[in-house]
Amino acid sequence: MKRLFLSIFLLGSCLALAACADQEANAEQPMPKAEQKKPEKKAVQVQKKEDDTSAWIKTEKPAKLPILMYHSISSGNSLRVPKKEFEAHMKWLHDNGYQTLTPKEASLMLTQDKKPSEKCVLITFDDGYTDNYQDAYPVLKKYGMKATIFMIGKSIGHKHHLTEEQMKEMAQHGISIESHTIDHLELNGLTPQQQQSEMADSKKLFDNMFHQQTTIISYPVGRYNEETLKAAEKTGYQMGVTTEPGAASRDQGMYALHRVRVSPGMSGSAFGAYIESMK
């Protein structure tokens, strides 16, 4: 009888041990794919295309656009505007409801006679000085403004000029880098072939550096001739800007657009009156 009980006890123990082992094995197995929790997909925000003008305001006459012309944000001569004055100008634009444009938006506004806001402006800087990054860029970010820097190709990374890294950082925050030619030569003193080379090489440089279609060129020192205008169109630009005074309009020709020179010594209110006079 004792032997029978002992046999039953041993048999039960073996069965219990087998069941435990089976449970442990199952616990170590991965969850079936159907039961695994899949990572949640993040919602993707689709940004409105830059060339979507469906909600823009139609103008009753050829659109006029003030294209502001700055150079260095410092002091010392008539091309330099101190940071304090520059900030006063940007604050005035912000407080008075002006929308700052990209070159692409400016091109659409001038060619389609439509505008994204009642008050628009294109802010530009010639030459690509380091202080555009150190002093202008923080102010532009503060007020949520776009701007365009016309960079000299050969000056990238040179003393007092922007580096590639600085330009790429700004390009991620609403600052467009566009063409001021390769060598900053007075174009009206060059042959047609030399002009084309200056423009084409600069466009290729910035197209590749920023994975973009470089849209606009600023002629060095404002010097140009009829061959310059032909070369700008032939090399693939959509616009060219000069130093001729006044607001831009397509009546001037898309490759001979005027600009509004901003000189030092202007308070915010004086700057505002100047801009309002361009209407």
Swiss-Prot record:
It is found in: Cell membrane. Residues 29-51 are annotated as: Disordered. Residues 1-19 form the signal peptide. It is a lipid-anchor. A lipid is attached at C20 (S-diacylglycerol cysteine). Residues 119-279 form the NodB homology domain. A lipid is attached at C20 (N-palmitoyl cysteine). Transmembrane segments: none annotated. One of its GO terms (molecular function) is hydrolase activity, acting on carbon-nitrogen (but not peptide) bonds. GO terms for cellular component: plasma membrane. It is an enzyme of class 3 (hydrolase). Keywords: Cell membrane, Hydrolase, Lipoprotein, Membrane, Palmitate, Signal. Its main location: membrane. Pfam families: Polysacc_deac_1. GO terms for biological process: carbohydrate metabolic process. Belongs to the polysaccharide deacetylase family. PANTHER family: POLY-BETA-1,6-N-ACETYL-D-GLUCOSAMINE N-DEACETYLASE (PTHR34216:SF3), PTHR34216. This is Putative polysaccharide deacetylase YxkH. The gene is yxkH.
